[in-house]
Amino acid sequence: MIPPEIRRSVLLQKAIKLALAGTLLTFASFSATAADPSSDTETPQPPDILLGPLFNDVQNAKLFPDQKTFADAIPNSDPLMILADYRMQRNQSGFDLRHFVDVNFTLPKAGEKYVPPAGQSLREHIDGLWPVLTRSTKNVEKWDSLLPLPESYVVPGGRFREIYYWDSYFTMLGLAESGHWDKVADMVANFGYEIDAWGHIPNGNRTYYLSRSQPPFFAFMIELLAQHEGDDALKEYLPQLQKEYAYWMEGVETLQPGQQNQRVVKLEDGSVLNRYWDDRDTPRPESWVEDIATAKSNPNRPATEIYRDLRSAAASGWDFSSRWMDNPQQLSTIRTTTIVPVDLNALLYQLEKTLARASAAAGDRAEASQYDALANARQKAIEMHLWNNKEGWYADYDLQNNKIRDQLTAAALFPLYVNAAAKDRAVKVAAAAQAHLLQPGGLATTSVKSGQQWDAPNGWAPLQWVAAEGLQNYGQDDVAMEVTWRFLTNVQHTYDREKKLVEKYDVSSTGTGGGGGEYPLQDGFGWTNGVTLKMLDLICPQEKPCDSVPSTRPASLSATPTKTPSAATQ
């Protein structure tokens, strides 16, 4: 475990903005070890900056089916020397770019295909996967895009060879359900380390993910750990919770009504809410060619604007969805940064409530009251600006047109999940979700078929869990059971047929993995494993747990959420 003094070290924000703005700076090597997040450590540069024209040429040549492959490749020597060699050789007769890459880089190894023992139940399969998906990267190669972490961690699986921020919370739910509290503690420690090192939790532990975060679930992770360790977990990680909050709220003190700065927005009435934002406005290294093609398809918009909105959608976790687009069939109409997301603000409400609880646990009642006041102000802003009264559901706010958006998405359940919804509105959301999103195989992400992976007909494990728990918070147990039972049936049928759990599911039926998006369907899969275990224990009583989904639907869920309802639910 990381010593508390390292966890609590107060670090200055790194010079990330300059390094990640796209300027090719002289490379300063950094200690590729997770021993100490020292403030003297330079922010490591992503491969598109390190390798400049070489990176661009390799990605545009499409040497690899997945653009993430070269983004994850490790230079075998100083990148500046490789780049100099490239500039000298590339115009020579017979130059072979693929051979040059093979000589100068170590490509990521293809993961060994896991073959589970025959006859395993769903629970046995998941329990057997935890060690398969566990990684340890305390030390990495000098120029690796992988960022070292002090403790072991569980990855999602497939092409996702690193830890991911919001994925990890749902993975942790399963680890806790399996009794692996040591792994939960290790992963929380890693995220605390990242906050100390970088000022925030990046999208994943790669240099090219440092310019953005993801849905802020760190507070939920601390609350989960506190179920096992008590208030000590809250007190121990209070400094990191405060730093994460500072990251999301950076610049709020200088905003005038109607202005935005990075991740924070002040509306005309003075309400403060947040949006997703990436500090860079260039193509994503892991999807370089795709982003360039998207920008070129809409010459009426500046390419940098499109790149920023693509990156910010990646920060949202919903990459990509009609939710962020003017035209669901045209990705280049994406404008994530002009949308105030309801789910993000619900999560930040939870962060403020957890900060209040942690401050109280640490004995600082005055600070606890301040965080409670911030949470109450955000809750009022959610009710004022993120409720669509005409449609009867929570939705996103459109900064460009100064109005609430009409689209219903699974994000509408997040205010229920964090107990921030008014009771009468929660009932309306439950009815809307049941009428428009509930499908034979679970809850659809949206009702729009755009070909993007965060749209119909796909359903995702984390959104099933948020919906089921949120609905239970407000006594909507019948709808919660339908979401839980239908999704579990989908997972079970797919497992019966393919002997694996996957990243996303087609919820228009049962037994089929989802499609769409930038890459093939991935298996593993961290958050599906975690949510499946939790749901198995929801539908089966504690005295008679089930290892697979039973053949007949139970009359009711066997457990209820343990969160204490906020004043909004009274």
From Swiss-Prot:
Domain of life: Bacteria
The entry's keywords: Glycosidase, Hydrolase, Periplasm, Signal
Bias (Low complexity) ranges: 554-570
Listed Pfam families: Trehalase (PF01204)
EC numbers on record: 3.2.1.28
Binding of substrate, residues: 159, 166-167, 203, 212-214, 284-286, 317, 518
Primary location: periplasm
GO biological process, one term: trehalose catabolic process
Subcellular localization: Periplasm
Reaction catalysed by this enzyme: alpha,alpha-trehalose + H2O = alpha-D-glucose + beta-D-glucose
Presence of keyword Hydrolase: yes
Region (Disordered): 544-570
EC supergroup of this enzyme: hydrolase
Gene Ontology MF: a single term: alpha,alpha-trehalase activity
Signal peptide: 1-34
Active site: 319, 503
GO cellular component: periplasmic space
SUPFAM superfamilies: Six-hairpin glycosidases
PANTHER family listed in its UniProt record: TREHALASE (PTHR23403:SF1)
Subunit structure: Monomer.
Function according to Swiss-Prot or TrEMBL: Provides the cells with the ability to utilize trehalose at high osmolarity by splitting it into glucose molecules that can subsequently be taken up by the phosphotransferase-mediated uptake system.
NCBIfam families reported in the protein's UniProt record: PRK13270.1, PRK13271.1
Record HAMAP family: Peripl_trehalase
Family affiliation: Belongs to the glycosyl hydrolase 37 family.
Name of the protein this chain belongs to: Periplasmic trehalase
Organism expressing this protein natively: Salmonella schwarzengrund (strain CVM19633)
Gene (UniProt): treA
